[in-house]
A protein has these predicted regions:
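Phosphate-coordinating loops and pocket residues in cytosolic domains that bind phosphorylated ligands
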Residues: 38, 111, 140
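Conserved tyrosine-mediated DNA breakage-rejoining catalytic core shared by Y-recombinases
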Residues: 87, 131, 140-167
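N-terminal DNA-binding recognition helix of tyrosine site-specific recombinases/integrases
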Residues: 8, 16-23, 29, 39, ...
Length: 167
C-alpha cells in the first residue's frame, strides 16, 4: 500500500540518510541491514552527540526513522536482522523547555529597521506570531479562508483545522 509522505517526513528521512553517510565516512563503519546492531547504536549515538554535538532528541529522531525503515524492510522480507528490536535499541528523548518571545521582544522586532526583502519576512513572521500559527502555515492563509469574524486554516503539521477569531 502506497502512502503519501509529508514534505517534513521526506526531509527527516533525507537528513537521516545524509547523517548515516557522514557517519560512514567519518568512522569507517559500513551501515547495512546486517550491521545495524547495538554496537552500531552506541557508535552512532556517540557520533551524533559528541562529533556533531547534536541533542539526544536529534539522535532519538534518527533512531526512530532507522527503526521504521528496518521494520518495513523486515515486513517485506528484505531484512533478517532483528537486533533493532532489542531493549537497548531505544528511541531516546528528553523534555525540552518551550521557548517563546515576550511581548517586548515581539515589539522590538516590529520596530527594527530592515531592508525591503527582510521587511516582508518580518511582517509575515509577526503576523504568524499574532495569529499563533507556525510559519509553515503561512501559505494556507488565503482570501477564501478569511471570514467575517474568523480565519479557518488546515494546519500543515497536525492536519487539523483551527478557527482563529478576528477581533
Amino acid at each position: 500500500q502506497r502512502c503519501e509522505l509529508k514534505y517534513t517526513t521526506k526531509r527527516d528521512y533525507l537528513q537521516t540518510y545524509n547523517t548515516l553517510k557522514e557517519f560512514e565516512t567519518s568512522t569507517g563503519y559500513i551501515v547495512s541491514f546486517e550491521s545495524i546492531n547495538l554496537d552500531f547504536y552506541n557508535r552512532f549515538k556517540q557520533y551524533i552527540l559528541n562529533t556533531l554535538n547534536h541533542s539526544i532528541n536529534t539522535f532519538g529522531k534518527r533512531i526512530k526513522i532507522i527503526k521504521s525503515i528496518l521494520n518495513y524492510a523486515t515486513e517485506i522480507g528484505v531484512n533478517k536482522n532483528k537486533e533493532f528490536l532489542k531493549k537497548g535499541f531505544k528511541v531516546l528523548s528528553e523534555k525540552k523547555k518551550n521557548q517563546y518571545l515576550t511581548s517586548d521582544e515581539i515589539e522590538d522586532i516590529g520596530v527594527t529597521e530592515l531592508n525591503d526583502s527582510l521587511d516582508k519576512s518580518r511582517d509575515i513572521f509577526l503576523l504568524m506570531c499574532y495569529l499563533g500559527l507556525r510559519f509553515s502555515d503561512y501559505p494556507k492563509i488565503t482570501k477564501n479562508n478569511i471570514n467575517k469574524n474568523h480565519i479557518d486554516i488546515l494546519m500543515q503539521k497536525t492536519n487539523s483545522t483551527v478557527s482563529i477569531p478576528i477581533h
